[in-house]
Amino acid sequence: MPKLKDLSRSLITLEQDATLIAVIDMGYSSWLVAGIVPGIERQPLKKLGVDESALLKLLYRWREEAEKAGHKIKRIAVAFEAGRDGFWLARWLNAHDIETHVIHASSVAVSREHRRAKTDRLYTELLKRCFLGWLRGERDHCKMVAIPTIKDEDAKRPNREHESLVGEQSRIINRMKATMARVGIRGFNAKLKKAAERLDGLRTPEGEPIPPNTLAELRRDMVRRRLISDQIKQIEDARLGRLTQAPSDGPHTMVRLLARVVETADMLVQEILSRSMRDRRAVARYAGLTGSPDESGKKRREKGLARSGNARVRRGMIQLAWRFLIFQKDSALAQWFRARTENARGARKTMIVALARKLLIALWRLVREGVVREGVVPDGVVLRPAQ
């Protein structure tokens, strides 16, 4: 496992007189760069086009201004908020020896006023305050996001595209069912291979064939569904091909190990289990399977699921937990769930989250150990044969 970093605060001593600090508010068509330059009383603010080379020149120019003011710059620290642009700029700046950090968007505290002023200039000031506190090593100013390599980002694409295509296929099928229901036809399975050939023989309750415009719409939907189905199969075949070609390569080993326990192994490995997690609490927190306490004075209540982490992992684990109760009913975890919900049916939704959290932590421990042995796999869980 790679060495873990504390992303909640900086562990490097901040020499403010020798550190050039900059934050970037990244827009679709322009970037607003705000800086703290040692020796310069004004705090510069510069609007740039979406141009990384111009950004680098600006940072070098500010460094020259600081050196002219008698401050030798030893460190340039840059930060921007995680968002649509991803991590390419952070990787590019790091490659040019610029220390770059990506701020977790939801960790930045904002004013609770009902109508607060919000402009790019004000937001860069807010980011500067957060980043400066983080650089000083103070906690709770903001949190940073681990910057993945381009290979790690690319490894997530097949699963995410597969999820998107499956959702699109479901939407097309549901739309076809709704179209047929409008003319009184029910029970038609649009997923059958010969479904398109059967359309001409369908009749409405009045004994009439499907109207021509509706029939044409259904045929176009079937073409779209067939195309999406082929693309889903291509993704699944490519995934099996990668596992076959490099069975002992890092994440692929994890996938083959987890495949003995769960069918969502590839998604879990790429989204969470290949990441460096400090402990089981960090694993549960990343998946958003933790609670949201609301405590003040004598009030003690729970607001429910935090939902602050990776939604794909959270959704997949809760689905897996329900299936686990069906297919691993003799396991210790399934018995634990039944013992706590047997006389409290209203607690099932709460306890399924707890079961999902326990399962995720058990899978994380299994991947960390790298072998299937007693004490790692939960008691009573039946494994598939190794492949």
Predicted regions and their residues:
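A detector of single, family-specific signature residues
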Residues: 1-387
